[in-house]
C-alpha cells in the first residue's frame, strides 16, 4: 500500500512540473513575440471562421505577426485558457498582454482601435 501512494505522489508531482513547463513555454512565446495569435490553423489556412476573421484583420493592419496553431499543439491548447484566463480561441497577445478573442478583436478592428495598438507593438 505504501509504495502505491508514493507512485501516485510522484506522478502528481511530475504532472505539476509538466503543467508548469507548459505555462513557462506559453509565457516565453507571449513575451518573445510583439504580436502573437494563438489560432486554429495558420493565417494562410485557418481552420475555423473566428481564426480566419482575426488573422485577416491582423494582416490588414500591415504588420508582421507570429502565430501558433493550437491544433498542432494540444498542450498549448489545453493550458492557454488557464494562462490567459480566456476560454476561447483565437487569442491575440500584443506586447505581452491579452487583447482578446474574435469578438473583441473584430470590434477593435472595425472601430479603428486595433491598428494603433499593432503599430505601437512593432515600433517598440
Language model features with spans:
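Acidic beta-strand-to-loop metal/phosphate-binding motif
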Residues: 38, 91-95
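Thiol/disulfide oxidoreductase modules built on the thioredoxin-like
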Residues: 82-88
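Short secondary-structure boundary/capping segments
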Residues: 27-28, 106
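Non-catalytic, surface beta->alpha helical segment in thiol-disulfide oxidoreductase systems
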Residues: 94-123
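Eukaryotic intrinsically disordered and solvent-exposed regulatory patches
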Residues: 23-24
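Thiol-based oxidoreductase modules, predominantly thioredoxin-like and allied folds used
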Residues: 59-77
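Local sequence-structure signature of Cys/Sec-based thiol-disulfide redox active-site neighborhoods
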Residues: 28-64
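Short, Lys/Arg-enriched N-terminal segments with co-localized hydrophobic residues
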Residues: 3-19
Amino acid at each position: 500500500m505504501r509504495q502505491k501512494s508514493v507512485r501516485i505522489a510522484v506522478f502528481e508531482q511530475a504532472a505539476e512540473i509538466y503543467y508548469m513547463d507548459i505555462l513557462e513555454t506559453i509565457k516565453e512565446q507571449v513575451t518573445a513575440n510583439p504580436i502573437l495569435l494563438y489560432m486554429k490553423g495558420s493565417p494562410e489556412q485557418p481552420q475555423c471562421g473566428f481564426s480566419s476573421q482575426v488573422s485577416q484583420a491582423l494582416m490588414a493592419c500591415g504588420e508582421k505577426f507570429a502565430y501558433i496553431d493550437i491544433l498542432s499543439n494540444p498542450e498549448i491548447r489545453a493550458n492557454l485558457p488557464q494562462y490567459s484566463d480566456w476560454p476561447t480561441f483565437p487569442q491575440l497577445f500584443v506586447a505581452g498582454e491579452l487583447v482578446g478573442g474574435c469578438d473583441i478583436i473584430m470590434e477593435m478592428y472595425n472601430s479603428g482601435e486595433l491598428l494603433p495598438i499593432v503599430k505601437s507593438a512593432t515600433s517598440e
